[in-house]
């Protein structure tokens, strides 16, 4: 049996493991991880569809939310509209966070080739709500994206296991006569490309994927959207609550599916947290060993701190080191 090297138990080894990866590398690699997790979830959805109890034999479970809210079958479409609206608003907020980062580092506001009165100022001006700004603005857009995408990937990966473990009877009308999946590979690809909207899947109940993304947007704007404009918090809160109502009223999910998803999403988003180094170092361990998709060490200045960069001379075949300080440029 091979004996682990002594340095694995030394403080220097774990210090290297805890050293943060460049933020740009984290953005690229965690986005790739999210795509991989999406395929895992797509396969899990297909397994769940095949394992779902026969609706003709097993009736939907008793649900207090179903008893209190009148059934409106088409409301799930409005839930999708809520998600679409929040997607657009989150992209807009992320861009405004990028402008805040540029303002913090002294880059100024970007300019369009052609100036459109009103429009250019609305999109390219820096919005800052000082009452809710308690976070360092440098790299805030990158850190916010890392926090969002890692939280989403963790929740979808856990959901992949949960929906396969226990099969529940479907409460919605669309799955009372579930269609047969003729081409499994095509269905998996459509699930990833359309986020489930263009594929066949029934029985994926515990917990609600719609609620996960609604709550993620809610948490994103509660923390970061409020830094851009004070109105984002109340607007997103109302939209998210209405989306929850649409999910239950349409019988798309049981009430427990929604409640569990809300709790898990909030807990995960808080646990991942906001850190100048990006994702928690434990999560970075899963992408640290990658030989591609970004550098494993900081070769450029991200926080206006001097770093060491190695330059290789092609003529002499030798390496020289140079300290790069952003403040000197």
From Swiss-Prot:
The keyword Membrane applies. One of its GO terms (cellular component) is plasma membrane. GO terms for molecular function: ceramide cholinephosphotransferase activity; kinase activity; sphingomyelin synthase activity. Residues 1-26, 96-147, 233, 279-329 are cytoplasmic. It holds the Pfam family PAP2_C. Disruption phenotype: Elevated ceramide levels and growth arrest; cells were arrested in division but replication of DNA and organelles continued giving rise to cells containing multiple nuclei, kinetoplasts and flagella. InterPro entries: Sphingomyelin_synth-like, Sphingomyelin_synth-like_dom. Its EC number is 2.7.8.-, 2.7.8.27. It is an enzyme of class 2 (transferase). This is Phosphatidylcholine:ceramide cholinephosphotransferase 3. The gene is SLS3.
């Amino acid at each position: 049996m091979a004996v682990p090297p002594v340095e694995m138990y030394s403080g220097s080894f774990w210090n290297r493991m805890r050293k943060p990866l460049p933020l740009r590398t984290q953005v690229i690699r965690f986005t790739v991880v999210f795509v991989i997790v999406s395929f895992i979830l797509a396969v899990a959805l297909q397994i769940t569809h095949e394992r779902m109890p026969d609706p003709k034999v097993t009736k939907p479970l008793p649900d207090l939310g179903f008893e209190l809210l009148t059934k409106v079958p088409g409301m799930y479409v409005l839930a999708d509209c809520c998600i679409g609206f929040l997607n657009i608003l989150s992209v807009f907020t992320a861009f405004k966070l990028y402008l805040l980062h540029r303002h913090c580092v002294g880059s100024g506001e970007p300019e369009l080739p052609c100036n459109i009165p009103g429009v250019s100022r609305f999109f390219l001006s820096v919005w800052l709500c000082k009452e809710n700004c308690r976070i360092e603005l440098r790299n805030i857009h990158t850190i916010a994206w890392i926090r969002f995408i890692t939280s989403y990937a963790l929740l979808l990966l856990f959901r992949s296991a949960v929906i396969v473990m226990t099969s529940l009877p479907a409460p919605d009308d669309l799955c009372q006569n579930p269609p047969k999946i003729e081409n499994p590979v095509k269905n998996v690809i459509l699930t990833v490309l359309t986020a489930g909207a263009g594929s066949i899947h029934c029985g994926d109940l515990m917990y609600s994927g719609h609620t996960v993304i609604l709550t993620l947007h809610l948490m994103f704007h509660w923390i970061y959207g409020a830094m851009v404009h004070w109105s984002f918090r109340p607007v997103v809160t109302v939209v998210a609550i209405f989306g929850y109502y649409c999910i239950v009223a349409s019988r798309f999910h049981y009430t427990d599916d929604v409640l569990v998803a809300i709790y898990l999403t909030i807990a995960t988003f808080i646990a991942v947290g906001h850190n100048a180094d990006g994702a928690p170092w434990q999560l970075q361990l899963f992408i640290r060993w990658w030989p591609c998709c970004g550098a494993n060490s900081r070769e450029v200045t991200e926080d206006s701190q001097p770093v060491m960069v190695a330059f290789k001379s092609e003529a002499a075949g030798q390496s020289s080191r140079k300290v790069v300080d952003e403040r000197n440029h």
